[in-house]
Structures are given as C-alpha cells and as structure tokens.
C-alpha cells in the first residue's frame, strides 16, 4: 500500500499476544494518527509466500505469534507510529514494528541501468532532493545520497539510476554545474568495477579514522600530500583521484619525486581525502597521504617553497578501507579502483574527466623522523583495465 509519491503508509506489527485484537491495535495506533485499516494474521506463515489477503510479504515474520498490518492515511503518521510503538509492550509482550514490505518494494536489480554520479552536494541535500531534481529527465530506478555509516551524515555525493541511457546522458549534460541547495553540483557517469586484489603492504597497514585525521592539523590547513607514485603521476590522475572528496583549488605534481600536493576548498574535504586515499593502490603503487605543511599563508606560491627540507616522511599512516568489502546488495567492491577512483556503497565508481589547469601553490608539512624506504611497486594487477565516504 503506497501513496502516489511512493511513500509507504502501512506498518507491520509483530510479536503480538494472542489476546490482542484488531480493535485494540486501532485504538492504540489511532492515538498517533488516523488509521485506515488493520488486518490481523493469526495463521502460521509460510516464509516464501505473500499473504494474499493483505498483499504484503511475511518474510519479516519468523515466529508463530499473531501479527498485523496497520495502514495509515498519511505517511508522516505511519512514520511517527513506527518510532513511537516499536519496542512498546502491548498486553505484556514487546511488539516489533517495521514498514510492511510488498514484492514490488523489494530491492530492484539495477545493474543493467544507467547510473549517474552526483558530486559536491550540500550537507542538507537528501535522497528525495536529488530524486526530485533529476526526475524531469526520465524514469528513475534508484537514487540515493551516500552517507557515512558511523555518523549518518552525507558524504557529499550520491547516485541516480535511469532506465534509459539517453535520459541519463541528458541529466549529465544539463545538471552539471546547476545549483542544488547551496552548491553547484557535478555530474558524470558512474561505473561498476571488479574488486582489486589486496597487496601485502595494504593488508599490513592500519585504517585511519576521520575524527583523528581532521584534528591532526589546524582548520585552516586544506592541503594533502600524496606520495609513493613512482611512475605515471600526472595532474589528471590526481584530479581523478581526489575530486570526489570536494572542490579542488590547486594541484601540484612532482613526477620525478613521486609525490604531489592537492589543496581543497575546506579542511574537512582534505581530511576525507586523506582517510580514503591513504594506503590505496594508484598506478600499481600503494600511496601515502597526510597533511601538507601549515604556514601563515596557506596559499603561498610553490616557487617560494624550498622543497629540499622535506626529503623525509613525517609519519606513515595506515591502511585504507578494506578491499573487497561485502555490501548488502551482494557486490564485493573495493573503495578504489586501479586509478584511485572511489567506490560508493552500491559498488559504483566515478568516471571523472580532467578539468582546467589550476593556478597557484601551497607548502607542505615538514616531515619528521626517518627517510622513506625506497618505493617497490607491487606486482601488476593483471586483468584490470583503466579505471574510469549510510545511504538512504
């Protein structure tokens, strides 16, 4: 039972006492909002079928206790009832309340659909916001803003899937650079990638935490050092790798030394980049990321910087997010592809195109401690072609 806008209005209520009646349920739930109906089920469920009398799946019901479906007139009332009644005791039993599911509401297979990456999202933008923004371009099969699983906050990007390729192409062309909330968004194709094998060096390093990294340098520092790329280091490669984490102000690469500096518009974007990119494989090399040098003028020109004082590493951060993490939709996806592109929780990577060259420069954090060991590239990752942050 869905409204025209697709928002659910029906709740599953389980673990009921056999003394509970439809009248009692309606009396209790109607205190929260007007109820349209209540259907009590007392028969033993078959876990593989749909109850034909109500049209809802009983897959979520695994006991022999009675259960029921309560339908509201308004989605907001159903949502309020879910929050208020789940875990409450009715006639001595703690009831379980959840959204009722129908066969049509089960997760759709969108692997053959056309997926659009949407970046630079404002923190307040929700899944419904991007779905509404892209709806004029055609029928959408899925849309979601990617969230941090620990904090529940938006990671600043999302994905929209279309049934039709032409609709997706038009959305990319016409929505790129448009304002959504307080920011201009970026759009591009999103692509699925095979999982990359772990290297020994990656397996033996430690994963960083955003809360730790963001506090390791002052809020004014927006510069990331990325080193360890012995070959293939280019401005385009760094832009592809780091652009999903926020607006990039400047990039400076030093191919002969195997490192680069990337300056973001915000401290938080830089911290997310360090956490996510550090320890990943780029161009066949496991990279190290940490904060660039703090100076009174964070936009100091590169030509004024003496890089000879930074021939040592200040610290070695640990490993990236685990490769091949199993996701709920059955895909095994690494957080990064061979060329360092991030992967979202649905297994999509980001195909980023190079943008215009950036001007200016910035300093780097003076390393402390021992000089870095010589870079020894891991074995080539054969079989992989060139690669192209509590979703809602």
UniProtKB/Swiss-Prot annotation:
Biased composition (Pro residues): 369-380
Cross-referenced SMART domains: RRM, RRM_1
Protein's UniProt keywords contain Nucleus: yes
PTM info: Phosphorylated by MAPK14 following DNA damage, releasing TIAR from GADD45A mRNA.
InterPro entries: Nucleotide-bd_a/b_plait_sf, RBD_domain_sf, RRM_dom, RRM_dom_euk, TIAR_RRM1, TIAR_RRM2, TIAR_RRM3
CDD domains, sorted: RRM1_TIAR (cd12616), RRM2_TIAR (cd12617), RRM3_TIAR (cd12620)
Residue ranges of the region described as Disordered: 363-392
Tissue: Expressed both in primordial germ cells (PGCs) and in neighboring somatic cells.
Keywords: Acetylation, Apoptosis, Cytoplasm, Lysosome, Nucleus, Phosphoprotein, Repeat, RNA-binding
Cited Gene3D superfamilies: 3.30.70.330
UniProt xrefs under Pfam families: RRM_1 (PF00076)
Modified residues (Phosphoserine): 218
UniProt KW Phosphoprotein keyword: yes
Modified residues (N6-acetyllysine): 139
Domain (RRM) ranges: 9-102, 114-192, 222-294
MF term (GO), any: DNA binding
Cell compartments where the protein resides: Nucleus; Cytoplasm; Cytoplasm, Stress granule; Cytolytic granule
Function per UniProt: RNA-binding protein involved in alternative pre-RNA splicing and in cytoplasmic stress granules formation. Shows a preference for uridine-rich RNAs. Activates splicing of alternative exons with weak 5' splice sites followed by a U-rich stretch on its own pre-mRNA and on TIA1 mRNA. Promotes the inclusion of TIA1 exon 5 to give rise to the long isoform (isoform a) of TIA1. Acts downstream of the stress-induced phosphorylation of EIF2S1/EIF2A to promote the recruitment of untranslated mRNAs to cytoplasmic stress granules (SG).
Database matches in PANTHER family: EUKARYOTIC TRANSLATION INITIATION FACTOR 3 SUBUNIT G (PTHR10352)
Record's subunit section: Interacts with FASTK.
Domain writeup: The RRM 2 domain is required for the binding to target RNA, and the RRM 1 and RRM 3 domains seem to contribute to the affinity of the interaction with RNA. The RRM2 domain and the C-terminal residues 290-339 contribute to nuclear localization.
Name of the featured protein: Nucleolysin TIAR
Species of origin: Mus musculus (Mouse)
């Amino acid at each position: 039972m869905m409204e025209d806008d697709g928002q659910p209005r029906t709740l599953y209520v389980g673990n009921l006492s056999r003394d509970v009646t439809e009248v009692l349920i309606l009396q209790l739930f109607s205190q929260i909002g007007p109820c349209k109906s209540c259907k009590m089920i007392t028969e033993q469920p078959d876990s593989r079928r749909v109850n034909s009398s109500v049209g809802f799946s009983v897959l979520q019901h695994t006991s022999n206790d009675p259960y029921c479906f309560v339908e509201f007139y308004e989605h907001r009332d159903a949502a309020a009832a879910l929050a208020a009644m789940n875990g409450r005791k009715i006639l001595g039993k703690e009831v379980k309340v959840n959204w009722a599911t129908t066969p049509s509401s089960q997760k759709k297979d969108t692997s053959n659909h056309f997926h659009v990456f949407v970046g630079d999202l404002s923190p307040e933008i929700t899944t419904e916001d991007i779905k509404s923004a892209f709806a004029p371009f055609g029928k959408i099969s899925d849309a979601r803003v990617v969230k941090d699983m620990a904090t529940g906050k938006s990671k600043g990007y999302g994905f929209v899937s279309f049934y039709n390729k032409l609709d997706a192409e038009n959305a990319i062309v016409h929505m790129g650079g448009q304002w959504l909330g307080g920011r201009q968004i970026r759009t591009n194709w999103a692509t699925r990638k095979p999982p990359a094998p772990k290297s020994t060096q990656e397996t033996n390093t430690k994963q960083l935490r955003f809360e730790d990294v963001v506090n390791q340098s002052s809020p004014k520092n927006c510069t990331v050092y990325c080193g360890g790329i012995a070959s293939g280091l280019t401005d385009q490669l760094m832009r592809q790798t780091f652009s999903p984490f926020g607006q990039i102000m400047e990039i400076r690469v030093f191919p002969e030394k195997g490192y680069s500096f990337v300056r973001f518009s915000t401290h938080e974007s830089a911290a997310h980049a360090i956490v996510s990119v550090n320890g990943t494989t780029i161009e066949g090399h496991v990279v190290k990321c940490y904060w660039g040098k703090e100076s009174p003028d964070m936009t100091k020109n590169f030509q004024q910087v003496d890089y000879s004082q930074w021939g040592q590493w200040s610290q070695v951060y640990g490993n990236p997010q685990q490769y091949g993490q199993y996701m709920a939709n059955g895909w095994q996806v690494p957080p990064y592809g061979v060329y360092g592109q991030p992967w979202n929780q649905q297994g999509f990577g980001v195909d980023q195109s190079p943008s215009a060259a950036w001007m200016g420069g910035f300093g780097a954090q003076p390393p402390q401690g021992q000089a870095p060991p010589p870079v020894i590239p891991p074995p080539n990752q054969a079989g992989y072609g060139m690669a192209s942050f509590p979703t809602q």
